[in-house]
Curated annotation (Swiss-Prot):
Its EC number is 4.1.1.11. This is Aspartate 1-decarboxylase. GO terms for molecular function: aspartate 1-decarboxylase activity. GO terms for biological process: alanine biosynthetic process; pantothenate biosynthetic process. Binds 1 pyruvoyl group covalently per subunit. Keywords: Autocatalytic cleavage, Cytoplasm, Decarboxylase, Lyase, Pantothenate biosynthesis, Pyruvate, Schiff base, Zymogen. The modification Pyruvic acid (Ser) is found at residue 25. It catalyses: L-aspartate + H(+) = beta-alanine + CO2. The gene is panD.
Length: 116
């Protein structure tokens, strides 16, 4: 039987911008994408710590080292600059193949979205 497990998480990133008129998605600094084992265009769940909003979108490439976390398109209505968010990816795995010591990649960031 397959189960869904957390694959990666960027914890308490600070939203640096919100662009309502952009086509859609979430722009994320590629240093954070790589550190969390995520991929460009991968589906993500986003939780806004400030207002409780939860939504799904996909990642687009942000400039490395920029700390950029931008809510684009309709997602811009669910958060604003300065909000803290959690970005989560999931994977489908065979339950019997999931190692007992499985650990997802979790990236904690500082107030400028630099990996701690």
């Amino acid at each position: 039987m397959q189960i869904t497990v957390m694959k990666g998480k960027i914890h308490r990133a600070t939203v640096t911008d919100a662009d309502l008129n952009y086509e859609g998605s979430l722009t994320v600094d590629m240093d954070l994408v790589d550190a969390a084992g995520m991929r460009v265009y991968e589906k993500v769940s986003v939780v806004n710590v400030n207002n409780g909003a939860r939504f799904e979108t996909y990642i687009i490439e942000g400039k490395r080292g920029s700390g950029e976390i931008c809510l684009n398109g309709a997602a811009a209505r669910l958060g604003m600059k300065g909000d803290k968010i959690i970005i989560i990816t999931y994977a489908q795995v065979e339950e019997k193949e999931l190692a007992s010591d499985y650990t997802p990649k979790v990236v904690h960031v500082d107030e400028k979205n630099r990996k701690r």
